[in-house]
Amino acid sequence: MTQLSRHMPVSDANRLVLGLLYLSRVPRAAATTPGVPTWAWLLNRTTDPRDASIRADVSKCLAHWLPAVEDRDAGATSLVPTVPSGSDRLVRALVRAIASAQQVAPLLDQCLSDLSAAHADGDKYFTPVDLARLMVSAAVPRDGNRVLDPVCGSGGLLVESHRYVHDRVGLHPTMSLVGKERHMLSSQVARMNLAVRGIAAQILPPGDSLAVPEPEQHDIILANLPFNQSGWAREEETQGGPSRPASAAPLDPRWPEEPPSPGNANAAWIQHIAHALAPKGRAVFLMVDTMASTRKAGPIPRLRERLLRDDLVESVIALPARVSGPSRDTTPCLWVFNKDKSARPGWGTHDRRGQVLFINARNAYEQLPNSRARRLGEKNSASISTTLAAWRGLAEAGSAPPPYQDEPGWSRSCTVTEIAAHEYSLMPTSYAVEPLSREQDTRGRVERLKRELMERLEEMRDLEPRLLDALEEL
């Protein structure tokens, strides 16, 4: 890959490898049609080192077989990476290496990681594998579930959902996997990623999932959401439909009380997901801290109050910065929705209605060597998953559910009444805190006494003129 990237941009090099993996691993009904380029034909063309047409042969195969992306504005578009001149020897070796590879998953994961880093601007990013595994384990998808990722990127959360269920039920899970992505390139990558792994999924044409409500409800929703997304709009607005005054009753069923701000999609995403959940559905999604912590009176605290009133919030987990994408320095929280938190057969043994679990995993990360990059890592992901499972009373097959108890500085279970007393804040660092040491407690008491004394002195200064006036009147 390093040698190839000397001849072409890193993103194009990775897309070329992905395309060749796709050609080599996905069977095609039309492969025996005369005149149609096939993987076997391409592999045979690499045997003659003097043949200078290998680049054209690769481009021909990719153009014919790569999945076209249906865009409502541009029509069907095949995004074929350009094979640069001077790379014939490397391309020939690459085709042969891919043909002989026994395990493609590690190469596929590395390509997706490199591609995410190369496109780490704005909302073009893919979910790291360790974070995807944490999100899926928190959602607990089951065989037969309908799973949606409305911002699917490379399809990593759909891949992980399939793996999670496959590991528990064996071959051929019957779940339905649906993804949608705004960017044509990412949409094509998602199709190839799933197809190379032999996973059946429906990747919808590119578009903004927020434009309209989801047409169907889903049992599981997973999303590594864009933070503070601007420039989103409902479909009637993008098509020049009539605008309504802010005071008008909302027509969109996703926002039953007040429409979200058009300049920031955070609240819109939360309500879009909540509206798309089936009656016993669960959702796990990443959201910027401010949606959990803002206390200034306004629509955000009111939204949190409604979510808690509906008993939809199951857990909020504070994560470190830069574990959800290579360029995302903003600290995020992982939100877990559950429309049925009751104890029941096939689920957990603890009735958690009217309760929320807060996990403070802000420092749970591994620093990658010689880099600013971080990752959760397997150990930290497992700690979070184990804590949530214990709180739910949820056990793996054949084992008893682990016990749960609050752990200062790590986790705390709170009632909705307690949360209401904190102005409906959902910030884990406000609840799962370390106990104060004796010195810290003493210092805090001194500071409180100083503030009270200053307030009393201010009151005395305000009263002094009135006292003097009263004395003169005697």
Each model region followed by its residue ranges:
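Conserved phosphate/pyrophosphate-binding and hydrolysis machinery centered on Walker-type P-loop NTPases
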Residues: 101, 125-129, 263
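Amphipathic, well-packed alpha-helical segments that form the structural scaffold of globular domains
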Residues: 109-116, 136, 140, 162-163, ...
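Conserved S-adenosyl-L-methionine
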Residues: 121-223, 228-235, 287-290, 296, ...
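Long recognition/docking surfaces used for binding and targeting
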Residues: 15-120
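Short, solvent-exposed loop/helix junctions and linker helices
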Residues: 10, 84, 263-267
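Non-catalytic accessory regions of SAM-dependent methyltransferases
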Residues: 1-37, 462-474
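A conserved structural/catalytic subdomain of Rossmann-like adenosyl-cofactor enzymes
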Residues: 215-474
